[in-house]
Amino acid sequence: DQGDTPYNLRNCAYMEDFFKPKITWGNLNLKGTYSYVQKGMFINAPSPFIVTSNIAILHILNSKIADYYIRSLGVTRNGGYFEYKPMFVEKFPIPQTGLDSLELYPINPSKEQEKEIDDIIYQLYHLSMQEIEYIENRES
C-alpha cells in the first residue's frame, strides 16, 4: 500500500502498535521461541508480533503443546527449520480462563519453572497422560 506522498510509501494504520508491549518471534526457527518486548521498545529486524502485555500468552506460546500444534499446520524445511507464520500462530487457541497462575512466572523462566509452566498448560488444555507423554517425547 502507498502513503500520502511518493516519499511516504506506507501510511501505517497500526503505527501505535509498535510502541505497545508485544510478543515477537523469528519467522524461521528450529522451535518456537517467543520474546516479550516491553512498552516503548522496538524490534530491530522484520519479525511478526502480537500486541499484548499478557505474560500468560507468552508462556503458552513458548510451551511444548503450542509448538506441537503450530508445527502441525505447516511444513518443516531442510535442516528441521519451520516457518512460524503469523497465520499459524493466530490459529492456536488460547484458553479464556485459568491464566492467572501463569502470570506469576517471570518472563524468562528457569528450566525448572518451564517444566511447571508446561504442566499448568497441559491442565488448561485438559490433556491426558498419554497425550502429554506423546508431546514430551516427540522429535522436534
Would you name each region that the model predicts?
Residues 1-100, 123:
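Polybasic, glycine- and aromatic-enriched phosphate-binding surface used to engage nucleic acids
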Residues 94-140:
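Non-catalytic DNA-recognition/assembly elements of restriction-modification systems
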